[in-house]
């Protein structure tokens, strides 16, 4: 039951953060996928969360030619999250969230360049594509790191509450 609630909460947070007005690339999406990689031991659940939330939000904001690269970038974020635990240190979460944002940046901008419509299909064109993507990267990195720290901290606190409530219930029942 807990996995269903966590999945549903993450799905709603991811979709809504993408649909409400926001700064370019400043959404919960990356943090949700990093967290999903850490939280769900069954990797198919993380993948289902990613695909469903992206497809639903893309249905509303529009499908586009860069979708394969964007989805691949988000898949990389799940892969980075696999190396984290819900109780990972803040420093580790910060470092891995930054690495995930960087992976997304490199993959998604490579996809934009491969499309061949905005930049020359040369090394210089690739570098130009990455340079032009830097303003988007900073916003995403700040969002991914900040939202990841928040999600992991929230999960730590909520998971700490569950055993405490279970122990309190056992104590009350044993007093009778």
Say what each PLM segment does:
Residues 10, 30-34, 70-78, 145-148:
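Alpha-helical transmembrane segments of multi-pass membrane proteins
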Residues 2-6, 42-48, 67, 87-91:
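Membrane-helix interface segments
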Residues 50, 69-109:
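Short helix-perturbing small/polar motifs within transmembrane alpha-helices
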Residues 10, 46-56, 93-101, 168-170:
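Central hydrophobic cores of alpha-helical transmembrane segments
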Residues 1-38, 45:
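Hydrophobic transmembrane alpha-helices
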Residues 90-165, 173:
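Membrane-embedded alpha-helical hairpins and interfacial helices in multi-pass inner-membrane proteins
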Residues 16, 36-42, 79-88, 153-162:
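Structural signal for the C-terminal ends of transmembrane alpha-helices
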